[in-house]
């Protein structure tokens, strides 16, 4: 049965309670209202005594039910994810952008500025929706940024996002660096699949049921993608100056050791995120 509401406030109250009853986050109600009304959070608070337009009411109630009953992410319902203050198109073919990845991007930008690199060549491996590559291209004028992904569907989204933000990024389809070993890059950045298949049963349904498995899981206890990338780097004619990986919070030592074994000329740093969990490994050519 389709609920009806006398005001936006009443719609928020109904949705929050419905979501709580299904063990979902009540704040999803506000995110969906902001999307369907095209309002800011402050507008939602200031005008919550107004009536919800009929079409928005129907779409809102349907989206709340879908999220509550299936776990489908809000970003898939709205088609939008946020990263570094920008909106990006997302769907079931790409990972939803996550705040921890912003810290990886900040680390790369700090390196470029600290080293005073005027025209750095950067490649993002496993680019997905393109948020890393597009953000770096936008925030680092003069940089030459590329993105690679194995998924054609993901690359379609990345291309749309680059066009939306006016970012000059070249996208390639491939298995990480496999077809680009002759190309020189100053920086290689990647948020590869790093979750072990053994962790699947412990994960939230909003992730495991809706994010693409290709972007989540890796063999060898989540380390297979790092090994592939590092093997490819070892075969490059010109090694990068900097390698930046996002990692699982318990993988810091394992990934750092892999780098030191496969690229002994590198110095590695395990870096925590804002919550104090190991989330990044940076490697620099000595």
Predicted regions and their residues:
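Non-catalytic accessory regions of SAM-dependent methyltransferases
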Residues: 1-37, 42-45, 49
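Conserved hydrophobic residues forming the short capping helix/wall of the S-adenosyl-L-methionine
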Residues: 19, 112, 162, 233, ...
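Residue-level signal for inorganic ion chemistry
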Residues: 32, 71, 101, 132, ...
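Conserved AdoMet
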Residues: 34-111
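Conserved SAM-binding loop
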Residues: 97, 124, 147, 218, ...
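Conserved SAM/SAH cofactor-binding pocket of Class I
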Residues: 100-202, 228
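Conserved Class I SAM-dependent methyltransferase catalytic core
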Residues: 220-284
